[in-house]
Amino acid sequence: MQDSYYLMSKNQFQDLYNDNSIYFNDESNIENIISCENVPFGSTIEASNNFDSNYNCNNINNGGINSFNNSSSIFKSMTPKKTPNGLKNLNNNIPTVNLAPISENVSTDTLNSQIVPSFQSNNIPQQIPSSNNNNNINNNNNTISSNNNNNTASIPITTTPTVVNNNNNNNNNNNNNNNNNNNNNNNNNNNNNNNNNNNNNNNNNNIPISNSCNFSNNLEKSTPIVNLIQYEQQPQQNNNIYQNNDTSNLNNNNIVCHTKDNENIETISSNNNNNYTYQDPNYQDPEKVQLTMNCFKLIQYCSQLTNLTKQAFSNPSAAACELETLSTMGNYIQYEISSLKSSLVKNLPNEAQQQQIRLQQQQSQQQHQQHQQHQQHQQPPTNIPQHINNCNIPRSPFDSCVPNSSYINSPLVANDFGYYSPNSMMNNNNDKINSEQGVFSSTISSPLPINSSYTSPYIKNQNSPQSKVVKKQLKNSKQSPTYINLTENMIRAQTKKQKKTISRVCVNCKTSDTPEWRRGPQGAKTLCNACGIRYRLQQQQVPQSNLNSPRESYAVIPTCDENIKQQTSQNSTTNINSSTTTTTATIQQQQQQNIPQQFPQPIQSPLKMLNIDQQILNSYENNFKNQFIEKDFLLMDSFE
């Protein structure tokens, strides 16, 4: 539940300012408050504000607290609050001892105004003034000044405080404290205890507004001066007050107040001499208006909560209803804080907007970096001293300065020193020197010298289409360890030697050119393709009738007459291994004896070869003299 407030007009504000009916000390007013079932919200703040200033130690039996407010014109509210039940027992439960006023600061913001304070660390006790407001006060000045030379009231040191009451009527009320009677015609206030003289000087009244309660401990209190601004733009507007000083620096406890109608009020501190200006609110922006209302209500609720807490502390007979009022005020404060927070969160950018802002920042940074790189690439290299040319600074971890070699400075080289690094400048100078000396400068950075045999194939084919493609790829690529390795691999691939080929000769036909080498009786890759096929077919075609006969046919390889002629011619010119000579000898012996060649028939099963008699093995060994072939090898060869 939230109270509805309205903005007072200029006339209403002036009426409230001149209305002194809210200040009273009559006991009948307390009876009226107790008799009322409902009172407007905000009536307790005036009572607590004037509690310390009007606390009369001599008049304790009459109630002690004589400043409860019965007017509802200060804080307008549509939500009435019940009167605390503790006030009914107020007259009977006040202690009979003289009490000093509470030493805490008391706020007297009794106007429906929005205050934005900025606190200063002033360790000056506040003073609660007694309100001397008359209907005939003429305000002519727009500043409030507190000076030591304008002391218009002499405050005696007494042990009992005095209460100054102001009446709008011309009637004179004689009380126990000799109250001042303010007449509308003369504007003269007479106080026997305080001896305050109010001088009427051209309708400019010097009104003492600080009457301190002086006790034996000399405790003093002061109230902050509330600055008000009236606006004539709308009939109902809030009064924005930007109060920059919470406590006014006062000397000798005297303040002379000069005010003027329809003017802005400024506070001037007597010691600091600070002028405070005020800012008009912008009523066209609803968000700012909402923030203003939230701040005003929050300050008002906090002030009321402070006053209610002081009242409950000073009243020993506080009922449970008053404590509930404190909790209710706390709930109002929490509600205003949450509404203020929600209105502030609305002004913050969303997550999507934040992401867009981040993307824009990243894009702008990238564009800036690209622009800088482009400018660096376009700038020509400058001349460098000669001693830098002779330095042995490597261009990369893989390169080094080699004599008779040159490097070309590429704009895409990424180093730690930028475009004008010592490495790049050294390379540019080397190019110039080498060009003057007639040395060919290669387009690839290589640690090898130019005149070396490794780089010559690449230099010869430099103008070929394939080399141009390689150049483009190298320009587009960045310098890195992989880039250098690729160039070295390209050079190595072009200068790579072929593997050494072993010269083989067929044991049977003595040929060295064959698509495939096959296994023979002497081992693997000893026969050419044709001889190996014939040898395998001969082993598979074994006649059944010759299974028990000596296997002389296994060693015979059918050869053509040309191969035989080649064998005879080669035997006369070249020396052949002992293994080849033995085979040729056996073939020649067979030809001389005119032994008919026997083609064996296929064996029914290869497993029958395992049952070959020992005589077959002996006959096979006799045919191939000077050859020691193991039995296991022969058996495995027969299965193929």
Swiss-Prot record:
InterPro entries: GATA_ZnFinger_Domain, Znf_GATA, Znf_NHR/GATA. Residues 122-209, 355-379 have a biased composition (Low complexity). A zinc finger (GATA-type) spans 506-531. The lineage of its organism: Eukaryota, Amoebozoa, Evosea, Eumycetozoa, Dictyostelia. PROSITE patterns: GATA_ZN_FINGER_1, GATA_ZN_FINGER_2. The keyword Cytoplasm does not apply. This is GATA zinc finger domain-containing protein 12. It comes from Dictyostelium discoideum (Social amoeba). CDD domains: ZnF_GATA.
